[in-house]
Amino acid sequence: SVSLRLTDPTGREWALRSVNKRTESLIPEELHGTFVQDVLDDATSAQHPYSALMIPALANAVNVPHAHPIIGVVAQDSILGEYAPLFEHTVALLEEREPLGDSDNSPKAVRKLQEDNDDNFKPKAYLRARMLDVLVSDWDRHEDQWRWYNENQDSTDRDKDYIPIPRDRDQALRVTQGFLMKDIYQQFVNPVMQGFTTGIPNIRYSLFKSRFLNAHPSNQLSHKEWTKEVSQFVSRLTDSVLWESVHSLPQSSIALRGEQIFKTLQSRRDALPEAMEEYYNFINNIVDIHLSDKNEKVEISSTKNKSLNVKVSKINKDGKVTKALMDKTYKDALTKEIRLYLSEGKDSVVIDNASSPIKLRIIGDSMPKTYVINQSKSKIRLYENTKESTFLGNAHRVKLHYDRDSLNTQFVPVNLYNTWLPLLTAGYNADDGFSLGLGAAYTHQRGFRKTPFTYKQQLTVATAFRTGAYKIHYRGEWIAVVGDADIVVDALAKAPDNTQNFFGVGNNSLFLKEQYGAKYYRSRFNIFNINPQLRWKPSPILNFAIGPHIQFYHLDPTENENRFILNPQALHSYDSLSITKDKAFAGINAFLTQDSRNRKINPSRGLYIEAALNSYFGLNQYSKNSAQLSGAVTGYFSAFNEGIIFANRIGGGTVVGNPTFYQYLFLGGHENLRGFRQYRFAGQQMVYNNIEARVKVHDVKSYVLPGEFGFMGMYDIGKVWAKGYNNDKFHQGVGGGIYYIVANALPLHLVMTKSKEGWYPYFSTGFRF
């Protein structure tokens, strides 16, 4: 919305907001005036233009403070001054900015609550306001859409007692329809954007934006308090209240969808108890409790039924315990972990947990604390950056994580929102034809200080239609499992009917295309790899990983009849006579990457360094030992204010021992030597150099696909070495083409490359390097 703050003669402030939304701020400048902006403009029509008018009737019924909006056409008025072109003769909403009087914004209110435990807010009023958001599907309730009125500001009581006031009802009654927006975008891309539908399909995301006070002690409502508030809220929303709310809309809106809105409100009201029960269970699975910067006493004790009671009290300046700040019992069947953040006060924590299995983490601060551990069923994980704290009782039940870095005690809210995402891959090349892959990725977020996730697992299955080959790929990543090291597990099955070119070992291997055709050199075999690793990230630009791996090989001779791979005299590999025998290997692999590029897409400066080591130890009589070391260094630099970008990559590797035919180093194709078939040359050593020049021609202000258009030239050179099958010739490919980077996000390029073996076209998304 375009907003303007107004002041009337009494000094009271009003907010004037356009009903029609402006989408320029939502997209990059290069997308302004394109179909993307038109799509967003059309999407804003999903918002009901008059939804704010419905709120007062509902809010009055459930005791939620509210503004008193009116909607009309802004008349011509000189008082608008320079803003007149934005507002005159437009439909706009006008409402008081602070309905109850002077109030604080959310950052100030949250800061006051953190600084002083004498300042508080009304958690049940906050719960009612959030339930009203759910009723009308107002999902965008971030911090800036709340005001906080101090109920004590006109009294002699200096302590603040905040009443939450929701405002800006832009997203209420939003309708999401269609396969892309409802079934794809809302489900997987942005599930927070909930629509005004019958029932409440995803309460966890309906309340996502307003979760910023979940960790406050006052917000730790018991289940009894929670359900009572929900029950009272629903009982007050009678059909007559809902009908009155609908009839607050203009007559044209009532005639168009009044009955539908009424029935949807009924459905959502009736679904609230079950939805809020689900949300209560959701937020109480792993609980944050964030105490203030003043002095507090925390008493944690188990109950007879293995629950865990947490009581927090204020400690005054004289060191005496005064008022209670929270007192809640967490059931072990529901709550798995409590994370207690102590902040800056001179706090004391007394633990008397004889039976509860609930995991307890305590995060201290630079201020010394006092810990009294009478008993604890399990180890207490304590994080501190001071060594001055006092430990009494069974201190051995504490597992201390000490670090002077302030990050060790920083408040990091738990992320409860695990996600899964469907995956789709597609591609085309001359050997495999069109390929298609489907899969899914699951991301688990709930770990303590695990970023960017706790663990992630993904599985894809792809097939190449020309060859009938399949590829099944699994990858799992667990963050900071062994100290600072991540665990990564990669499993790849190129089966059944994996296809790979093989022309024999040597720099002078023949490709008799006219005599045999390309299919003759395609080998069908199955490969299975399992590779667990430990990965370290010592800096933002450096990654290092190492771990064991296992590999299995199988080739069916009936699927390779009349093909090159069954011609042992031409293969020149140690396994030429055992190609059809199953093989198994185990070994160690390691990789290192260092990335100092200034950006990921078409970088103009920086280096990208990668290196990999793979060892293979044979596990049966047909499997021999070998090891492979490979790497590459890519440099980027530019001229004429990035009008020309040069990218140069030099790479190579060596193999020692007795590799199988597919374990050699390969040169050829899109990856490192254009102008030749994939896997064209196999050798024990390899070196190559790729250089590309990308010349920017024009920034295209296209309506449909804006982006950067340019020409590119490339030159590839390389060779392999193989004992007994070598020559001094370097293979070369030279070519050029065009590129187009769509919206600075998706590079596309088409090049034609010539070598001694002919012309080869290449089209792909993304640059090679």
Description of each model-found segment:
Residues 445-450, 482-487, 540-544, 554, ...:
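Repeated loop/turn-to-beta-strand initiation elements of outer-membrane beta-barrel proteins
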Residues 589-590, 738, 758-769:
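Outer-membrane beta-barrel "beta-signal"
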Residues 415-416, 473, 502-504, 513-521, ...:
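C-terminal outer-membrane beta-barrel translocator/porin domains of Gram-negative envelope proteins
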Residues 1-110, 137-138, 160-207, 329-330:
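Conserved ATP-binding subdomain of kinase catalytic cores across diverse folds
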Residues 177, 351-352, 363-482, 577-604, ...:
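Outer-membrane beta-barrel initiation region
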Residues 424, 438, 457-461, 487-491, ...:
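Membrane-embedded beta-strand positions of outer-membrane beta-barrel proteins
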Residues 428-432, 442-444, 461-467, 480, ...:
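Transmembrane beta-strands of outer-membrane beta-barrel pores
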Residues 44-45, 150-327, 332-339, 345, ...:
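C-terminal catalytic region of ATP-dependent kinase domains
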